[in-house]
């Protein structure tokens, strides 16, 4: 049984890698409609870019990937089960359904390609042929050997729940100020999102501090204006 599972996992991984290699990201219609250049088209080299000084810790081990997925799913289930007590007007209500996320190598490849530019902003287009893709980014700086773990940075996103009004659950608001305050949290708990892939890099800043940069891509994308974040369990 273990051999069969291993073979199946390798087959799925190979298929996802083939999808990444086969996709013509420069002709992706979902990018063209917004006059945006896809990250994989704009940055064809997998090598970190010129902004990445003395870079290290590029990408993740399998154990780190599992930890990222598990932390996301732990937080999603906290909300789905009605155990999140924070919010601007009370606890977050439970969800009818909020499936666990799984790691997606194509999303991870695109996230890593963007992280490798060492530019702390969202990329213009990261969609794949299967669906539109959302994104969370985080960066911390340190002067010594201490470094932020991915899970600590994920919690920075999730903790936006303290500013979240549960009346927004049924229809994601169009107010950009709200998106700026809680958009990382809502992407984490967006019920229709099922895939995640992340990239990571550390590099030196001009002031000699070390920047820790995390990019996570999600599909299908959350934060769709007017759409429900999840269905509330009555």
Curated annotation (Swiss-Prot):
Occurrences of domain SCP (ranges): 69-218
Key words, A-Z: Allergen, Disulfide bond, Secreted, Signal
GO annotations of cellular component type: extracellular region
Tissue-wise expression: Expressed by the venom gland.
Disulfide-bond pairs as recorded: 26-41, 31-125, 52-118, 198-216
Signal sequence region: 1-22
Record flagged with keyword Transit peptide: no
Coiled-coil stretches noted in the UniProt entry, renumbered to this chain: none
Region ranges (Disordered): 80-99
Domain of life assignment: Eukaryota
Protein location: Secreted
Membership in a protein family: Belongs to the CRISP family.
Protein known as: Venom allergen 3
Species this chain originates from: Solenopsis invicta
């Amino acid at each position: 049984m273990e051999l069969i599972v291993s073979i199946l996992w390798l087959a799925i991984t190979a298929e996802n890698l083939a999808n990444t290699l086969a996709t013509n990201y420069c002709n992706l219609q979902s990018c063209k409609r917004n006059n945006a250049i896809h990250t994989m088209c704009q940055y064809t080299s997998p090598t970190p870019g010129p902004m990445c000084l003395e870079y290290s810790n590029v990408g993740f081990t399998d154990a780190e990937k599992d930890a990222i997925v598990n932390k996301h799913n732990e937080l999603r289930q906290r909300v789905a089960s009605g155990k999140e007590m924070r919010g601007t007007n009370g606890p977050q209500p439970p969800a009818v359904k909020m499936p666990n996320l799984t790691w997606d190598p194509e999303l991870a490849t695109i996230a890593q390609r963007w992280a490798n530019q060492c530019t702390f902003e969202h990329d213009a287009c990261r969609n794949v042929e299967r669906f539109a893709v959302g994104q969370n980014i985080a960066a911390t700086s340190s002067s010594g050997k201490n470094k932020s773990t991915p899970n600590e940075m994920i919690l920075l996103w999730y903790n936006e729940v303290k500013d979240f009004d549960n009346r927004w659950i049924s229809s994601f608001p169009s107010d950009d100020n709200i998106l700026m305050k809680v958009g990382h949290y809502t992407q984490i708990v967006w019920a229709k999102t099922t895939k995640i892939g992340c990239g990571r890099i550390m590099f030196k800043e001009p002031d000699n501090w070390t920047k820790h940069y995390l990019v996570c891509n999600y599909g299908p994308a959350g934060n769709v204006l007017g759409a429900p974040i999840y269905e509330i369990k009555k």
